[in-house]
C-alpha cells in the first residue's frame, strides 16, 4: 500500500546507518549518522516530513542552528525535522541528495551530513477491502464491510516521464481462486475526458496516458471494478481519488497593467495611496500561488528614490517619505513586481505592472496681484458694465479650488456699487458696476481689493502678508433723462369736469445740474384723449369731459403718461404717469334689466323680477323707485309693479287673462342721488300660453307675430334686390334676341342705303304697326296676301270687316336683297291703303333737305285727288266717323 500527503513511507525504519569510528571517546558534537538514506516517492508534496536527523550538541544549548543546503526545496526545524519546502519531483532535480549543516553561533563550528533519496521500484498496491461474516443466533447471515480508508493517488501535473506512467496496482485477494478482470470507470476513464487513465484488466495496473493540468482539472474520481470471466461482480467497486499535484507553471497576472492613484501633495509618511492586486492560477494554498510584491523602480527619483513603499503581501502602496510637492514633481511612476513562491527570486515566477501616482494640488500657494494699481472708467447710470480686469498669479493647479481666486473689496465702496466676480477661465477679477453711479454725486472711486482662494491655505503654510491692489475708477458724465417727481402722481377729481379745466402741474427736473438744459413736455399715452399738457410748464388741462363710467377707467383710476425731454446732445427723455382718481356724480339714469321677459297668459304660474341698473355708485344709485305710467290706462289696469328691495321689483299680471303676444311696457325708475335722475325704460314682454309647469308652449307663434321693424325692412330690401335682378335679366335677354335678329339681315354692300335713312317723328300708329318679321324683308317673294297681317292682330279703332275693294297686290322686289326697293313699294302701298292711320289727319313733315332718296311720303295732299276716290264706305264705320262720312261721302247738300 502506498501512503501519500505528509505521511512517511514505512520504509524509513530500514534506513542504513554506517557508524564510523570505534572506542570510547570524549563527547564529540556532531550528527549521529554520517549519511541518511531515505526511500520516498518521486513526488514530494509541500510540508511532507522526510526524516529527523539527530545531533549531539554536548551541551552547547541554544547557540546551535540547522541550515538546509537547498532552502528552496527543503527546510529543517530546530529539532532536526526535515520536510519539503515545496512540491517537487525528485527526478527533475539535479541531484538525489541533500546537505544539512549544523552551525554553532558562538564558536562558529560547522558540521555537515548528507541525505540520499531513493525511490521504490514497485508501484503501490491497492487491495479491495475484505469482508467478515457475522452469524446471528437465528441462523441469519449479515455481511459487514470493514472500515478501510483508501489513500488518494498523487500525480504531479506536467510530468515529463514516459507515458503511459504506472500509478498504482489494483488487486483482489480472490484472484488466487478465480480468474478476475479489472476495470475503472468515471471522468478520465470512460467519461470525458476519456482515455486519460487506463487499467490492465489482468494485472490491474492503473496508468496515466498523458500529462495532467491541475488548473484544468484538479482531481479525478474513478471507481475500480473486479469481475470474473463470466462478468460476475466479485468485489464491490472501490473509489480511487487521483489528486493532481500543483507545479509552479503559471506566472502572476496583474488585474490591470497600469494602475492610477492619487495622493495630496505634502502628505505625511504613511499616507495610503492605492492597492495593486494580481492573481496566480496555481494552488493558492501552496507556495506556487503565494505572491509577494515589491517596487522595482521610481521615476523621478526626487526628492528621494524611495518616496513610496508597498506591503509585500497585500499590495498596498503608502508614502514613506516627506517632501511631495506638486509644483516640482506632479506625478510619479512606479514599476511593481509580483513574484510567486513567496517571493523567492530563484524559483519564483514574476510579472510587473506600472503604478502612476498623481499628486493632488493643495492650497499651498496664495494668489498674488500682477500690479499694485488698476485703472478703469464707467459712464454714469450704467449697470452690469465691466470697468477693468484684475489679474493674479497662482502656482497651484489651474481649475482647482486652490487656484480659483476670490476677490473682495475691503474699502472705497461703502454703498456696494461694485462687485468683482471671477472669470472661471482666466481667473481674472471682473470689476463690475452693480448699482448706477452718479457723476453729480461721485466723479471717481478708489477701491482696495484683496484676493484669496476658494479654499484656505493648507495647514502649515504661512504667508507674510495678504496680496492687495488699488482700483481707480473714473465716472464719465452723460446726458441723463429728466425725472418726474413724484412718479406716478395721483390727483382726485369729480367726473364731469368741463372742457379746458386746469387739473394740475406735472413737472420733471434734470439731473444734469451742470448742463443748464431746457425741458419740454408732451403727451405720450392718453387712451380717452381727455388731457393736454403745456409743453413749456407742464400744466395739464382737460380737452374733454371726464367720465368715470368710461371703459378706459379701471377702479375709478384713469392713467395717462407724459414725456419730458431735454435739449441735450443726444436728447434724453423720461416718462411720468398721472393717475386721476375720479369721484362719482349722479350723471347716469337707471334702466331696467332684463330688457326682455316672458310671462304666462294667466297670472298664477309666474311673475317677472326686474332689476334697476345704474352706472353710478352709491349714494347716486339705489335704492330705486319703480313706477308704471298712468297713460295709457290699460297699463295699470293690466299690470301691477311691486317693489321687492331697493334694487329689485316684481312685475305681474293684474288681470286674470291677457292675450298672447308681445307687449312693450314702459317702466319708470328713479335713483337716490342728490338731484335724482329718472328714466323710462321699455320692457319687452312676451305673453304666451303655458303648460302646467309654467313653461311657454306657443313661443314660435308669438315670435312670428312679433317680427320687428328691422326684420321687415331687411325682408323688403331682399325682395327689391331680387326683382331688380330679374328685370335686368329680362332686359338682357331681350337685347340679346334683338342683336341676334339684326345679324340675320343680309345686305348687299352695293345697295346699302343705310347712310340715307332718316329718322322722322311719327304721330300716331301703334306698336303693332312695327311688329313685322325681318325675315320676310329678305324673302319678299314668299309673301302671301293672307300672311301680310297675322290673324288676331287688329287695331282697336280698325273698321269692321266687310267687303272692300280689291287692290292690286304689290309685286315682289326683283331682288330679295334690294331692301330699298322693297321699302319704296311698301310706302306706295301705304299711301293707297284707306285703313292706314291716321284717317283724317294732315301729316306735316319737317324739311330735311334735298337729295333724299326716300321721296315724299303720302299725305292728304297726295297726287290722288279726292274726286278719284269713293268714300261711301265711311258710312259703314259707325258714329265715330259720321262727321268724316258727311264731309266726303255725303251728297251735295
Swiss-Prot record:
Entry binding sites for Ca(2+) 1: 157, 213, 215, 249
Disruption phenotype: Morpholino knockdown results in a disorganized mid- and hind-brain, and enlarged fourth ventricle extending into the midbrain and/or the split tail fin or tail blisters at 24 hpf. The mid- and hind-brain regions continue to show a misfolded appearance at 28 hpf. As development progresses aberrant early brain morphogenesis occurs due to disrupted cell convergence in the lateral neural plate showing an abnormally wide neural plate at the 10 somite stage. Embryos also show defasciculating retinal axons after the optic chiasm and irregular axon branching in the spinal cord motoneurons.
An annotated Gene Ontology molecular function: cadherin binding
Keyword Transmembrane annotated: yes
Chain intervals with Low complexity compositional bias: 851-867
Residues linked to a glycan: 260, 312, 389, 442, 559, 609, 638, 679
Main location: membrane
Outcome when changing residue 148 to A: Does not display significant adhesive activity alone but mediates cell adhesion with pcdh19
Every Cadherin domain range: 148-254, 255-369, 370-484, 485-590, 591-702
GO biological process: adherens junction organization; auditory receptor cell stereocilium organization; axial mesoderm structural organization; axon guidance; axonal fasciculation; brain development; calcium-dependent cell-cell adhesion via plasma membrane cell adhesion molecules; cardioblast differentiation
Assembly: Homodimer (via extracellular region). Can also form heterodimers with other cadherins (via extracellular region). Dimerization occurs in trans, i.e. with a cadherin chain from another cell. Interacts with protocadherin pcdh19; the interaction confers robust cell adhesion activity on pcdh19. Interacts with ctnna1, ctnnb1 and jupa.
Name of protein: Cadherin-2
